[in-house]
């Protein structure tokens, strides 16, 4: 190919002519062509690449073709906005006092807003990390009581598999049974929460694995544990095929090999996992599973539907099995079933009995969100008042701008851009405050961990963009539009006076203090309500009691005999469940009504040991034979529910036995104080089922008795960890959460008061 026949790439030449400015195209095109032919004389292949490179190299802002329309206007606008931006930065340094007040106030308020938004974002996006989450549902049962319907996470053990086998809409069923077992590795032994789950657990849920395979639960000899548990027992995480010994309630010790290690459970998970075992293990080694039937309950049942299917597809089949369950269980009868999406379980768990998840009350979340909005509004009004007060120092600037041709629109734009710059600085500072101080403090106060990231990029941009624009407009709109309306003649003649004495300024100042007052009062009302819980009567004296968990009758008798010899012990008693720590719910028949009650199977001295007060009747008497078989003590809530005026001697049916009321105990709190006290029945239970030994110590000797129990335990059950608790600590998690809420409210009150004071200082500083 000759030199004259060699041409540069046509597409590159067209691209050059497309972007290049008409005034420069002749010069630039001539240069690249000259270079092309000069190189072509030496090398016939390289010049084409060189030509493309030169075309791209000249693709610079100054060489790009400008639009014919509004050419001058775009340059002017760009320069104008740039000058406004620079002026905004200069204004921050020039007016140090007002800028500091505004930025600090906004930063603190926005820092609180960022922290609370992170909390709300985490709360309302719980459990959304599961890849198949849109197809996973909790099978929640609505249980019929005498005059109400309760939501239960428990469901019939056979219901899930029956639905799966009877309908092709269901891909997987995952049942979860919970227990607390002793787990040992060498000399390291702890009592741990263990979940028994169906082998399809990892097919439904997307908990990430650190080591091992997701089919580990298909092996009945495998155990799955979390990263934290691996470090706790082995000091490392790569523990595949290592062995752990698990002690079951029947005193069976079974060795399992580690089949998989879970990464730390995601912060967005509402369920807390420590150990997983195949549910077949529960069926083989736990007493409750000896005779599985439709009366047997699963702790929770989750259903994964096939793609394209939904819960309504199995309505007919569900109704069929509800009738089967009702025929099999006359005590606990399902009225209906509600399918709860997995991402709603954590938010509704406060209203679901026996839920696997922990949830805060919606009112608390809404209240915190409202207070955050009030704080941001307070900071905005604080900014407006200080900005209005500082206008007097910029009146001449505004007048001169108008005289030399500046229109109202340009002045509005100037003030809004300056305000946006300041709000942007405040938002950056507030985000740093949230990251460094507020969020870490929040995470130390509550049992949940809120990460410093949003659920999605969309949420991130929406929040920061939305709050910046909202705060900038709310705080800057009034000063910008009102100031731009000033007459330049009056300004330059000194007749335009504007400051905090104007009517609108007074109105805004009033609104600011109303918001401050409302925020502080709301916080104080919340705090007062929390203090009410702190001072609330438990229904019994709880200062000198402690209790120990026992696994069997041998442990109970051995520890009881040792306790009986301790001079610091006033009384002791055994129980199958215990006030404030473990509850057994059941249904009793009162005439034609089925009533859900809390059942306490106790020893003869239980009421005396726990200081439970009788308001009517008598305590259990070991010398009266009927007290061992058919006598029962109920609480005031039971009496009120049944409407009995004379409860003594009344009877009801439970477990095919007619029980007669011999006493009425004063109401006592079995659960956290925001729960209504439920009806309770107490009866003498068989000692072989006792799982708690409750001890009442002499005044001031409770710690000595606790030490005695710890030392005695090593001789009673050397293979089991000691589990002893003080009775006044059974609601400790509730009180800790309550006190943490108080600290947040105290802090928010202080922030509101600080913002109000800063605004007042800013106003005063401009009027002295």
Name each model-derived stretch:
Residues 1-93:
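Negatively charged linear elements and acidic catalytic determinants
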Residues 26, 116-182, 294-302, 306, ...:
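Membrane-proximal extracellular/periplasmic loop immediately following the first transmembrane helix
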Residues 27, 91-124, 502-529, 540, ...:
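Short, strongly hydrophobic transmembrane alpha-helices
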Residues 85, 89-97, 101, 105, ...:
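Intracellular coupling helices
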Residues 115-118, 338, 420-486, 518, ...:
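Small-residue-rich transmembrane alpha-helices
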Residues 124-133, 144, 274-287, 349-356, ...:
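Short juxtamembrane loops and helix-capping segments at transmembrane helix boundaries
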Residues 198-210, 221-363, 561-737:
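Mid-to-C-terminal secondary-structure elements
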Residues 360-364, 448-474, 499-511, 548, ...:
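Conserved transmembrane alpha-helices of multi-pass membrane proteins
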């Amino acid at each position: 190919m000759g030199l004259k026949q060699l041409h540069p790439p046509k597409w590159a030449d067209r691209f050059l002519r497309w972007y290049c400015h008409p005034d420069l195209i002749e010069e630039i095109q001539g240069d690249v062509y000259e270079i092309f032919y000069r190189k072509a004389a030496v090398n016939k292949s390289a010049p084409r690449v060189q030509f493309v490179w030169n075309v791209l190299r000249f693709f610079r802002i100054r060489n790009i073709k400008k639009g014919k329309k509004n050419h001058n206007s775009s340059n002017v606008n760009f320069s104008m906005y740039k000058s406004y931006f620079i002026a905004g930065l200069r204004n921050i340094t020039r007016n140090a006092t007002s800028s500091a007040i505004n930025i600090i106030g906004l930063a603190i308020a926005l820092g609180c807003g960022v922290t609370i938004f992170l909390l709300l974002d985490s709360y309302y996006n719980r459990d959304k990390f599961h890849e198949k989450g849109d197809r996973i549902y909790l099978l929640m049962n609505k249980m019929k009581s005498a005059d109400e319907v309760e939501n239960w996470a428990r469901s019939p053990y056979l219901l899930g598999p029956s639905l799966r086998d009877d309908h092709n809409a269901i891909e997987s069923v995952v049942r979860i049974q919970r227990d607390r077992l002793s787990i040992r590795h060498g000399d390291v032994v702890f009592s741990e929460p263990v979940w028994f789950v169906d082998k399809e657990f990892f097919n439904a849920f997307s908990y990430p694995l650190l080591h091992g395979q997701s089919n580990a639960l298909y092996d009945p000899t495998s155990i799955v544990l979390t990263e934290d548990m691996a470090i706790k027992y082995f000091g490392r995480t790569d523990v595949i095929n290592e062995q752990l010994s698990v002690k079951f309630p029947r005193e069976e010790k079974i060795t399992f090999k580690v089949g998989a290690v879970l990464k730390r459970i995601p912060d967005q998970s509402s369920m807390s996992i420590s150990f997983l075992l195949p549910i077949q293990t529960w069926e083989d080694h736990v007493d409750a599973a000896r005779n599985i039937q439709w009366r047997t309950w699963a702790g929770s049942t989750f259903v994964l539907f096939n793609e394209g299917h939904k819960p309504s597809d199995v309505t007919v089949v569900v109704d069929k099995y509800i009738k089967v369950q009702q025929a099999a269980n006359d005590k606990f009868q399902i009225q209906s079933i509600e399918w709860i999406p997995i991402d709603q379980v954590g938010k509704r768990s406060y209203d679901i009995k026996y839920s696997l998840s922990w949830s805060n009350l919606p009112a608390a979340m809404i209240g915190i969100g409202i207070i955050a909005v009030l704080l941001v509004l307070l900071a905005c009004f604080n900014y407006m008042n200080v900005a209005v007060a500082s206008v007097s120092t910029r009146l001449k600037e505004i007048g001169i701008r108008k005289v030399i041709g500046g229109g109202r629109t340009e002045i509005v734009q100037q003030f809004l851009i300056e305000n946006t710059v300041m709000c942007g600085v405040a938002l950056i500072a507030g985000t740093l405050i949230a990251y460094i101080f507020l969020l870490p403090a929040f995470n130390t106060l509550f049992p949940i961990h809120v990460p410093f990231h949003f659920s999605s990029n969309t949420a991130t941009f929406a929040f920061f963009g939305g709050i910046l624009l909202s705060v900038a407009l709310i705080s800057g709109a009034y000063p910008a539009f009102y100031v731009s309306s000033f007459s330049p003649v009056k300004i330059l003649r000194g007749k335009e006076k504007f400051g905090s004495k104007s009517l609108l300024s007074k109105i805004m100042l009033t609104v600011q203090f109303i918001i401050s007052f409302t925020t502080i009062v709301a916080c104080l009302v919340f705090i007062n309500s929390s203090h009410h819980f702190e001072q609330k009567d438990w229904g019994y004296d709880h200062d000198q009691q402690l209790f120990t968990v026992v696994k069997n009758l041998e442990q109970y008798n051995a520890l009881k005999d040792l306790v009986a010899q301790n001079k610091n012990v006033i009384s002791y008693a055994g129980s199958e469940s215990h006030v404030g720590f473990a509850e057994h719910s059941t249904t009793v028949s009162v005439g034609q009504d089925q009533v859900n009650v809390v059942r306490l199977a106790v020893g003869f001295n239980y009421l005396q040991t726990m200081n439970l007060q009788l308001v009517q009747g008598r305590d259990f008497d070991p010398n009266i034979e009927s007290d061992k078989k058919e006598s029962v003590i109920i609480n005031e809530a039971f009496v009120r529910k049944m409407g009995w005026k004379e409860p003594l001697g009344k009877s009801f049916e439970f477990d095919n036995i007619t029980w007669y009321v011999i006493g009425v105990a004063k109401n006592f709190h079995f659960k956290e104080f925001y729960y209504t006290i439920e009806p309770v029945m107490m009866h003498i239970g068989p000692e072989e089922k006792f799982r708690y030994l409750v001890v009442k110590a002499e005044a001031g000797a409770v710690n000595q008795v606790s030490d005695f129990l710890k030392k005695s335990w090593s001789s009673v059950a050397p293979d089991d960890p000691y589990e002893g608790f003080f009775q006044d600590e059974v609601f400790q998690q509730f009180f800790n959460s309550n006190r943490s809420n108080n600290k947040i409210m105290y802090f928010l009150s202080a922030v509101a008061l600080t913002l109000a004071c800063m605004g007042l200082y800013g106003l005063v500083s401009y009027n002295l």
